[in-house]
Amino acid sequence: MVRLVYILFLKHPTNTCQPSHVLPLSPIYGGTLLTSDRQLLNIFCLFEETKKTSVASLLTRSVSGAENALDALLNLNPVAVFRTCLVFPPWRKLDDLGHHLDIAHPLDAHLYDPIFVSLLMAHVLGVQRPSSAVEWVRLFRTNAVSLLVRSLSSRNILLRNTCVSQISEIMNALQVSFRGLFG
C-alpha cells in the first residue's frame, strides 16, 4: 500500500504534497530501515522540497506519540539504536534517499534508519536541546550519540559531515552546561 502511495507522490508531487495528504502518513512511519519506512521518509523529503516547509513536527509525533522532538528522541528504543550501530547500512546516504529501495535486510524492522536518527538529533539540537543534566544522561542512554559516532565511518561524506557537526554541537552544549554547574 505504501508503495502505491509513494509512486503517486513521485508522479504528481504538486498535487499530492499537501499537508492534508502527508499528515495521515506520519502515524505509520516508524523510523526503521523497512522499505515502506524509507519510502515514507522520501515522501516527507519530497513534501519539504515542494512546499519549502519542514515536516519535523509530523515526524515527532509519528515515532513515539511525543509532543516534541526531544521527547521523540528520548523515547527511541536504545537496544534498536545500538543494533543499528552494529549492523550499520553502508549504502545509506543522506543526499540520495530515493535510491536503494530494493535493498532489504532481515533485521530492517528492528533497526532505526540512521538518516532519521541523525535528522531528529539535528532538529533537537537546533530547536530544543536538553536543558538539564538528567535530560543529557537520558539522551546518551538512547545510544543516538553512539549512532552519530558510528555514522562517521559512513561512505557518504554529507552524512559524515552532518554527524561531525552534531557531535561538535553536543560537545559545546555539554561544556556550556557543565561550566554553569561547576564554574
For the regions a protein language model found, what residue spans apply to each?
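Proline-rich intrinsically disordered, low-complexity coils
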Residues: P13, P19, P24-P27, P78, ...
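Core helices of alpha-solenoid repeat scaffolds
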Residues: T14-L23, L97-G98, W136-S146, R179-G183
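HEAT/HEAT-like alpha-solenoid repeats
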Residues: L23-G30, H99-L107, V145-S153, G183
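Helix-rich alpha-solenoid scaffolding regions
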Residues: F140-G183
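HEAT-repeat alpha-solenoid elements in large eukaryotic scaffold proteins
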Residues: M1-F9, Q18, T32, S36, ...
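Alpha-solenoid repeat scaffolds
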Residues: N15-T16, T50-S54, A80, R92, ...
